[in-house]
From Swiss-Prot:
Annotated protein name in UniProt: Protein HEXIM2
Biased composition (Polar residues): 1-13, 64-77
Annotated function: Transcriptional regulator which functions as a general RNA polymerase II transcription inhibitor. Core component of the 7SK RNP complex: in cooperation with 7SK snRNA sequesters P-TEFb in a large inactive 7SK snRNP complex preventing RNA polymerase II phosphorylation and subsequent transcriptional elongation.
One GO cellular component term noted in the UniProt record for this chain: nuclear speck
Compositionally biased region (Basic and acidic residues): 112-131, 179-194
Family: Belongs to the HEXIM family.
Amino acid sequence: MATVNHTNCNTASPAALEEAKTSGGLRSPQIAHEPHDFGGSQLLPSGQEIQSEDEGTVPAGDGSSCNIRGSRTQSPGGCSVEAVLARKKHRRRPSKRKRHWRPYLELSWAEKQQRDERQSQRASRVREEMFAKGQPLAPYNTTQFLMNDRDLEEPNLDVLHGPSHSGSGGENEAGDSDGQGRAHGEFQQRDFSEAYERYHTESLQGRSKQELVRDYLDLERRLSQAEQETRRLRQLQGCSSRQPCQQVEELAAEVERLRTENQRLRQENEMWNREGGYCDQEKPASEGTPWPKVEAPFQTHTGQLGHREAGDR
């Protein structure tokens, strides 16, 4: 009678599984087919046994055996190969931590500044670590120094040139526009000076010695003419400045003379007024008291005669 194999499914070794795969039909145990019970599972009594053709009798109630229904291939230990392989297969899952990454063009100005600052700090830290290890360092690849040089001179072109408001706001906008216009003018002047110097240097390098001497003499002649013209203009400016001063002095003297003459005439007028009043007072005393005037009678509206009084007309 064949011995009964009591083997657990969880204790099947990989060597036994591989041997079961290779051997295939050489030692494939036959599985006993149990009757299908659609109404419910039938429990076999503890003493009942299942007969197998090769292995003999196996107790039905033993928990260590793997009893699989259907025609599936089992390992010599009694467990299926597919179940073991499925249990040992490693399945990778995506990380639960999601990186909130956005393109550089979609970032705001503050976010761009923060990202650039982080990258510069990281680059500086890496360079320090490499320098500490004694490794050769390449120059830091950046063009920020060029942008800093240009930002000092370039004006702000994003300012809207609209009508200025009244009050302090208008004054502030006027001051800002004046400052921006001045900065823009200085930038254009410096740019023109640099371009002119570069062009002049290139033109001088391409000239011969005789041409340079001739240009030098021409420049000396122009310099002497400019100095003479400057002296002449200064002399004219001095004369023109002296003439208004003389005119002002003459006008001041004329005003003073007229003021003195006016004061003298006022005094004479007051004196004549005093003398005229004194003569009027002495004339009635020499001629005597005047006779009273006789008022002529007049006729009233009622036909009666009357006399005018001193206050009547």
